[in-house]
Amino acid sequence: MDTLKGKQIMVCTFMGNARMYEALRDYGDRISQIGLFSFKVRATGEIYESGVAISDMLTYINRWPHIKWLLTVANDGANSIFRALRDNTDGAQDRFLSEIVRIMEKYPWCDGIDIDLERGDGYSTHTESTAMFCNIYNTVKAYDPAKHMNICLPGMTSVNGSVGGENWCVYGDLDAYCDTASIMSYGMAWAGSAPGPVSPRSWLEGIYDYATKVMNPDKMFLGMPAHGWNWQIYDTP
């Protein structure tokens, strides 16, 4: 019996503050997988280093060898970047794939790649979007079959069931192109939305029920809401 089945924990280094480093120091023994938020991608497909410096993470990488350390590549929710990569505009996707290989070569100790591409388009683009993730997955596995690939996915309660316009994402189609998937089920309302509940129970249950029906449940990390917003009618939170 696998006593850890269903009890894995994934976190990311998005915050980059003192509290984050304290948590890594004190609680790293409880973490299974970490996305290193140290890479961003441009609309040209170029990947550049930004965010938490890899050099600042080496102490924790060496201290906790049981953790899968993944290089996270993000587009910061820029639709123009997502679209250029998806459509291979001026060879953007081709360059992106070669850049993924480059950063794995630069940091050979990494356990794999974490893809955080957000703010895609509607359902009419789901085939092309899935093809992009297929190409990323095949690129990672062609480089080294042992490298792990995690993908970050928006909260969905059905096909075409995004509250944030992310209907390009079809869980069942993407299941084959990841080793794990982090479902962002922690933000029905967020800093860029209208005021509302962060993650109402009905929405969370809808995501969990749908995701476990169409994806391999053993692959999934489900995001847990542990925050709130100070909504203000005269300013952003």
PLM region descriptions:
Residues 77-82, 113, 190-192:
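Short acidic/His/Gly/Ser-rich catalytic and metal-binding motifs that mark active-site loops
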